[in-house]
């Protein structure tokens, strides 16, 4: 009996979204009547500041943050507004031309907390609004220190920018400033300067509402208000450095980045965090080949605009002096020859050809890119080799840190390099080496001596080919050593735990003779299959998407800056 054709299930249509028309400085813009709450997702009335953003009108603000609950305490976003006038009979009053007459409100409103209504007109550039901004800035600067020459926030400071754009040219305040604590050690990663703090409460709301920890608060009163941690409690959760990102004035500074580099010297590169399977979007700040910081990059589908401290600080190994820099082979003279790579690739390809037919194994790291794992899988298929990857599990949390510390476990499964579950083939590989069935082992990005393949087993191999970034016991035992690159030194893609395929870009050059692994793996695949592969990462990704079902339909260009989710 023939099987009936599957009925296509179409998603239910989304309910219509009510929209309202408002005018911002005379320009009409249509916005949704409600927008989702950044914490709960429940609909909240669209506010003036959101309508202004839709009209591409910048409204200065300090306390407002689009991903935090509204506080409405800085008053910097004050605007004037009007609504359609109505008569005693509650009918609209019309102008002679038939348009609605606008009744201007006698009082300004804070744009961050005032909902829009149909027909509302918002004015952000009137003389009164400019005067209000001057007044707010004057109050904020009364006790603010002139720390700009030594402040880490200089160059990306909203107080600095708004003072130039909206403030007065001179201060009228002649009385002594109120002095507050400076260089307050809040915890293992944060230094607080209370004199710079403008009490916007962004950091308090972040720790309370995003992290779920009441760690910070405002103490004292009036001009003597200060930010402080709770008595006897360190500010030490795994997300503290996000408060440095959202602090608009440099009151909270990172001990890691403090006094290291002026931000206007940094080159910014869009990349991904590789410390776990979440795949947080980041910006790498570098100068002259040195990485100075990781910062979160906004992607609502992955990390919103946050990242954990563990991932943020996990970058110094990239610039380690211990990095592997030279290709090595049993012929020691190769190390000093300029053509070392081509010679070693030739030798390695010959060794692999001899191992074809089941006497080889391939272990690829789930910290490698999708493209590299795809090439490893092709190489293993050509050799008839057993493959696997190394699991890397630790404690996660409810926010961003995933228990899987490999950034590309999903990619390792989709490309076929990893067993299911990951690591289940490692005992088989160890047994194959022990019995002499496996004579050649190719390891990329892992120290397998920590995962059941000790030096005694590796010593039984006829050929051990290793590619890695830092020295290990496995690299020490290698017959052929191929220095690879960190993710910040190459381009490629990862697939996170939820199946989102995302790009990372090259920020700095690799040291010495190190090369992106996909380059020499492509050469090995070409030599063994006698077919030339793509010479660019774009072409390689598109080839992978055409051959691997899990990436079907994707293109490098189509990934954009925030990625595409696939079924896993």
Predicted regions and their residues:
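A basic, amphipathic helix-loop patch mediating RNA/tRNA/ribosome contacts
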Residues: 48-82
